[in-house]
């Protein structure tokens, strides 16, 4: 087999493998970005960069939409059919539409500002392994505190705008590698007293705009500079992340029906310490 073909097939394999990693870690509170940075390092592979990582998140975004398609359809239909000019939105699902929109504003605004005014962000020390390790440890402690002090008595019907604003601000911290978008939003929701499984579902739903938009922006930017043959590995990564995301979402929701999140606290703590000791 010619060396060029062998190298190309290996790139496709890496994209497939990293797509699985992306999908599985996107919806667990352990940071997909951190794992997409650390796993290639452990295997001695080149870092495929921010654009690749963001692009294959599209598979995860499509997975959320597919998994929650019935609830999303209900949310959209309720939003456009239940508005009362004198009373506003009283239906739970129509309010959830507003909440998803509000929670998405901070991360989209800050993400745009970083892209416009911090062009070298992808090469900054914040994406280094040391920063990821420290962030992982800090986030594990915050998640532990949310388990200890969160009342966990709120369902979707009890969620208010204040809860969502705090969750949206927390979500913007996910712009920094190692934070974990699902992890920090879950932590915020637990601190607000939201029940675990409801908190996870809310975390997944509010992530749809941010994950979708960032993925599309980076994918379109890659389309402008890459040939069709170079895009194929990215498409492979998107597809594999879709299927692993479906598995991870279902697994996590079932897990939270009977368990707390302390296993992820221990994992993130160990993950951070492992990185620090292997730098």
Swiss-Prot record:
GO MF annotation: an example: undecaprenyl-diphosphatase activity
Swiss-Prot/TrEMBL keywords: Antibiotic resistance, Cell inner membrane, Cell membrane, Cell shape, Cell wall biogenesis/degradation, Hydrolase, Membrane, Peptidoglycan synthesis, Transmembrane, Transmembrane helix
EC main group: hydrolase
Reaction catalysed by this enzyme: di-trans,octa-cis-undecaprenyl diphosphate + H2O = di-trans,octa-cis-undecaprenyl phosphate + phosphate + H(+)
Short name of any one Pfam family annotated for the protein: BacA
Coiled-coil regions listed in the entry: none
Transmembrane segments: 10-30, 48-68, 96-116, 128-148, 203-223, 229-249, 259-279
Function according to Swiss-Prot or TrEMBL: Catalyzes the dephosphorylation of undecaprenyl diphosphate (UPP). Confers resistance to bacitracin.
Protein name: Undecaprenyl-diphosphatase
Species in which this protein is naturally found: Prochlorococcus marinus (strain NATL1A)
Designated gene of the protein: uppP
């Amino acid at each position: 087999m010619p060396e060029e073909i062998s190298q190309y097939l290996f790139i496709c394999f890496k994209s497939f493998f990293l797509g699985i990693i992306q999908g599985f870690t996107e919806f667990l509170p352990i940071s997909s970005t951190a794992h997409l940075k650390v796993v290639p390092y452990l295997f001695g592979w080149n870092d495929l960069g921010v654009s690749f990582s963001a692009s294959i998140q599209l598979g995860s975004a499509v997975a959320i939409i597919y998994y929650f398609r019935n609830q999303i359809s209900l949310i959209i239909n309720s939003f456009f059919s239940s508005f009362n000019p004198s009373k506003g939105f009283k239906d739970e699902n129509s309010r959830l539409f507003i909440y998803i929109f509000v929670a998405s504003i901070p991360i989209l605004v800050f993400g745009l500002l970083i892209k416009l005014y911090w062009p070298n962000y992808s090469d900054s020390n914040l994406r280094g392994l040391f920063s990821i390790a420290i962030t992982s440890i800090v986030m594990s402690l915050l998640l532990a505190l949310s388990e200890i002090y969160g009342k966990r008595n709120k369902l979707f019907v009890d969620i208010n705008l204040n809860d969502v604003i705090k969750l949206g601000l927390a979500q913007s911290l996910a712009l920094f590698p190692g934070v974990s978008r699902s992890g920090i939003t879950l932590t915020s929701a637990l601190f607000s007293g939201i029940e675990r499984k409801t908190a996870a579902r809310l975390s997944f739903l509010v992530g749809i705009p941010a994950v979708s938009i960032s993925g599309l922006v980076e994918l379109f930017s890659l389309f402008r500079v890459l040939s069709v043959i170079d895009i194929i590995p990215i498409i492979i990564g998107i597809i594999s992340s879709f299927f692993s995301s479906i598995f991870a979402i279902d697994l996590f929701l079932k897990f939270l029906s009977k368990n707390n999140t302390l296993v992820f606290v221990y994992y993130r703590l160990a993950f951070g310490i492992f990185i620090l000791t292997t730098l």
